[in-house]
C-alpha cells in the first residue's frame, strides 16, 4: 500500500501544474480589481497554489460475476489497497461492483467519493450471477454525471468475456434476438466504451482472463489496457493506469 501511494504521489509531484488562486498579494488580477472598492475584498491578486487538488476522479468498477467467485477475497483486498492509496494522495475514488441477476444488472457502490473511512466497505464485495458489461458501463456513465470533478477515469476489472442469460432484444438493424455472449457481447461492450470516451470519460481496463479473450480485450479497450496474471496484481496495474492519466493531464 505504501509503495503504491508513493508512486502515485511522486507522479503527481513531477507532473502537477500549480493553480492560480485569489490572494492578498502576488500578481495583480485586473478582472478582480473592482472587488476591493465595491465588496471590500482585498484578494485582487493571484498566487500560485503549490498544492493543487487533482483535477480528476477515479472509478474502479469490479466485475462481480460468478466467474470471480474463486478470488473474491483477493479482489476486495486489492480494491481496498487502491482506494486507500488514492485517498492518501487526495484523489477522489469510488469503488463499485456489478453483476446480472434474473435479468437485472446490479451496480453496487462499495465506497463512494468523499466517504472517509469507507474503504472498509469494499470487503463487502462478493461474486454472483452473470456479467452484462455493456449495460454496467452505461450505468457507470450515468453515475459519473454527479462526480466532483470535470475529468474522470473509469477503470474496469474484466475478463473480456461479456456473458448474460438474457438475450439482446431485436432492433431495427437486427430483427431477431441474440444471445448476449461471444461477438455480440463484445460489440455491445465496445459500443458503450466508445460512447463514454466521446463524452470525455477516459476508460481503461485491467484484464485477467484466458489468453483466448485477449483479442476481445483489445477490441473493446484498445491501448488503455493492462493485463495481469494474478489477481493480487490488480492494485499495481490500476495504479499504473492512473499514473498514465496524471501524465496525460499534464501534457
Name each model feature, range by range.
Residues 1-251:
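Acidic, glycine-rich A-domain
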Amino acid at each position: 500500500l505504501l509503495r503504491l501511494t508513493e508512486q502515485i504521489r511522486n507522479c503527481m509531484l513531477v507532473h502537477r501544474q500549480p493553480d492560480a488562486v485569489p490572494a492578498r498579494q502576488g500578481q495583480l488580477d485586473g478582472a478582480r480589481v473592482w472587488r476591493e472598492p465595491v465588496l471590500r475584498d482585498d484578494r485582487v491578486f493571484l498566487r500560485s497554489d503549490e498544492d493543487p487538488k487533482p483535477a480528476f476522479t477515479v472509478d474502479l468498477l469490479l466485475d462481480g460475476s460468478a466467474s470471480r467467485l474463486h478470488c473474491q477475497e483477493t479482489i476486495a483486498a486489492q480494491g481496498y489497497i487502491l482506494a486507500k492509496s488514492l485517498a492518501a494522495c487526495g484523489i477522489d475514488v469510488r469503488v463499485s461492483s456489478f453483476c446480472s441477476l434474473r435479468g437485472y444488472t446490479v451496480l453496487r457502490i462499495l465506497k463512494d467519493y468523499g466517504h472517509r473511512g469507507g474503504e472498509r466497505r469494499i470487503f463487502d464485495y462478493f461474486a454472483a450471477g452473470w456479467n452484462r458489461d455493456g449495460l454496467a458501463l452505461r450505468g457507470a456513465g450515468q453515475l459519473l454525471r454527479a462526480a466532483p470533478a470535470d475529468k474522470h477515469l473509469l477503470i474496469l476489472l474484466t475478463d473480456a468475456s461479456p456473458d448474460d442469460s438474457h438475450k439482446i432484444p431485436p432492433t431495427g438493424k437486427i430483427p431477431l434476438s441474440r444471445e448476449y455472449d461471444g461477438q455480440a457481447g463484445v460489440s455491445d461492450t465496445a459500443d458503450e466504451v466508445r460512447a463514454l470516451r466521446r463524452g470525455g470519460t477516459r476508460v481503461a481496463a485491467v484484464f485477467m482472463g484466458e489468453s483466448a479473450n485477449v483479442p476481445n480485450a483489445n477490441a473493446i479497450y484498445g491501448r488503455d489496457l493492462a493485463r495481469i496474471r494474478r489477481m493480487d496484481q490488480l492494485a499495481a496495474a490500476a495504479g499504473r493506469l492512473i499514473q498514465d492519466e496524471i501524465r496525460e493531464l499534464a501534457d
